[in-house]
């Protein structure tokens, strides 16, 4: 139409009137030397206060999650935070004091992206989390370029195989090889950043992948195919919460007695594990 056109995110448009009204120097006074202004994050997941938060660039992840977000509810432990939307990376506890700016976030394997910030506690399986995001990325692939179309599909197949208890020793190397190929040859940002959830979880939580593959065990007890659904009588507090929460009536329990799971009735919904206050079910 022979008219100038501006294409940007809504967040960028929202900042423009304030910059015009108050001046560039006012805006540049907020943030860091290389990342100016504020950033809006959608804070969600295993955190007490969820919602949209606007913070100055340079604030740390710890301040956002624990000071603004109120920390992890139900006395669970912080495990990781996923930044940047589906193609972002997972950052572990060791990097909670990372400043929120473009350069620092990139150094720990994540991206600012769309401003998504998903907090995860110790009951989150990082392999299953990578599978979840890869499922989304594969579904969103337009199919134009082969690396993204076929590569993400193959990565998803491997992750599904691992979480279902059929992982093989070479799967980790293959995931890394596919990730490198997709990042370097995909045509657009989706494919180039798509492997991030897998690469970051492999970097920081490689032991979970190895437990799934070599021990056929899910440390977080979220992959039903790798859970035995057995009650540890020595750890069980005999509270009966698991029995009351079981939708299939598969858990036998009497007062002052440890619970017992009838495996023929168990539908592996994980409700007992989610609700057990003593983590007595494995």
Outline where the language-model segments fall.
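C-terminal accessory/binding modules appended to enzymatic or scaffolding proteins
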Residues: 37-49, 55, 219-271
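Short pre-active-site segment immediately N-terminal to redox-active cysteine/selenocysteine motifs
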Residues: 141-144, 235, 265, 275
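Ferredoxin-type iron-sulfur electron-transfer modules in oxidoreductases and energy-metabolism complexes
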Residues: 99-228, 233, 253-260
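Hydrophobic alpha-helical positions that pack around
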Residues: 1-57, 69
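Secondary-structure transition/capping motifs at alpha-helix termini
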Residues: 71-76, 140, 165-169, 275
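Terminal amphipathic helices with adjacent charged low-complexity linkers/tails
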Residues: 72-107, 203, 270
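Structured functional modules or segments
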Residues: 267, 271, 275, 279-282
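Short amphipathic, charge-patterned alpha-helical segments
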Residues: 58-73
């Amino acid at each position: 139409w022979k008219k100038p056109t501006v294409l940007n995110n809504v967040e960028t448009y929202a900042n423009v009137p304030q910059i015009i009204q108050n001046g560039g120097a006012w805006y540049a006074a907020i943030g860091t030397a290389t990342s100016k202004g504020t950033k809006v994050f959608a804070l969600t997941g295993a955190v007490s206060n969820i919602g949209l938060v606007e913070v100055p660039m340079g604030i740390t992840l710890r301040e956002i999650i624990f000071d603004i977000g109120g920390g992890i509810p139900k006395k669970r432990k912080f495990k990781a935070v996923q930044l940047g939307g589906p193609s972002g990376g997972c950052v572990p506890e060791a990097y909670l004091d990372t400043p929120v700016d473009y350069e620092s976030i990139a150094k720990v394997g994540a991206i600012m992206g769309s401003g998504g910030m998903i907090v995860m506690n110790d009951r989150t399986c990082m392999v299953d989390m990578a599978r979840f995001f890869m499922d989304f990325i594969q579904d969103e692939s337009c199919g134009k370029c082969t690396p993204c179309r076929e590569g993400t599909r193959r990565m998803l197949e491997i992750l599904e195989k691992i979480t279902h208890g059929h992982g093989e020793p070479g799967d980790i190397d293959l995931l890394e090889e596919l990730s490198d190929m997709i990042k370097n040859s995909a045509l657009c940002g989706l494919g180039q950043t798509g492997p991030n959830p897998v690469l970051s979880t492999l970097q920081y939580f490689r032991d979970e992948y190895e437990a799934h593959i070599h021990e056929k065990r899910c440390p977080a007890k979220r992959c039903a195919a790798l859970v035995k659904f057995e009650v540890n009588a020595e750890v069980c507090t005999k509270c009966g919460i698991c029995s009351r929460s079981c939708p299939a009536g598969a858990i036998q329990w009497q007062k002052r007695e440890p619970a017992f799971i009838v495996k023929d009735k168990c539908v592996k919904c994980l409700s007992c594990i989610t609700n057990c206050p003593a983590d007595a079910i494995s």
